[in-house]
Amino acid sequence: MLWDVFPKESIAGGAPMNVALHLQHLGLDVKMISKIGDDKSGRKLLSFIEKFGMSEDLIQIDNEFPTGSVLINDEDKENIKYEIVKPVAWDHIQWNQQIDRESRIVDAVVFGSLAARDEESRQTLFKILDSPVLKILDINLRPPFYTADLLDKLLTKADILKINEDELTLLANFYDLPNQMDGALEKLSELFSFELVCITLGSNGAAIYQDGEIIKHPGYPVSVKDTVGSGDAFLAGFIYKYLSKESLEKTLDFACALGALVATFNGGTPQYKAEDIRSIMDM
């Protein structure tokens, strides 16, 4: 959990927190494992998630390192520059008995690659990933914070992989995947024995690969205000329906609708109602 710091404002964000808040908003009981600094920024983040009713039980406070932030320069809209500040508090998430207990009784653990950029949080993450629960990897590749070895270890631990087109291209270079998307997803799934792979395709919707079958959705045409957090909303919608044992077709439809809905707002975690999602699906 962190702050996206723009020249004129700071917005609470970070992909894991966005996904967690959407899942909480959809009615699931979510606990986020993270760490904030003992500072004003950290306290403001706690106040922010409190509005969503999400538990703070597994959020640690660091007395040495500051709350996480990403410095964003968006003067050139075609070439937005950002710096993921390091080191920060969430690089130093410590393993404890509470995390051990909670990670064994949940329905699913959702994780990304950035949580593994520092040794301390990386060790904690891989202990969590030893838990016998569904593990969903939102890979969220951000150079220079990953290596081929780290990717191997993360992918090996995942049951479900969520990626976008750019990330598939990067993985194709690492693992010599076919150029065609369907073939690349098939080989990737075979390499790591995934339960399924989910890929977002921007304005072209999304697709799911499972057991030799690919299911595609064209997405929903909406008037876009802000795509920040749209992919996170998509993943939350996917997880929500997947854990509810819905069909993959219905799961993908709901996920695309929620991603499209969030793109019609400013910010990654807007307030919305169930009927807002249904109105998108009825288009």
What does each of the following model-derived ranges do?
Residues 58-67:
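A short, structured active-site edge motif that brings together acidic residues
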Residues 3, 34, 137-139, 163, ...:
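Active-site flanking residues adjacent to catalytic metal/cofactor-binding acidic residues
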Residues 33, 84, 217:
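Hydrophobic residues at beta-strand termini and immediately following loops
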Residues 7-14, 40, 66, 145, ...:
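Residues at secondary-structure transition points
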Residues 1, 15, 114, 139, ...:
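Active-site metal-binding loops of divalent metal-dependent hydrolases
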Residues 48-50, 56-59, 76-214, 246, ...:
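Ribokinase/PfkB-type carbohydrate-kinase core domain
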Residues 179-283:
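Conserved phosphate-binding/catalytic region of the ribokinase-like
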Residues 1-55, 59:
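Glycine-rich phosphate/adenosyl-contacting loop at the front of the ribokinase-like
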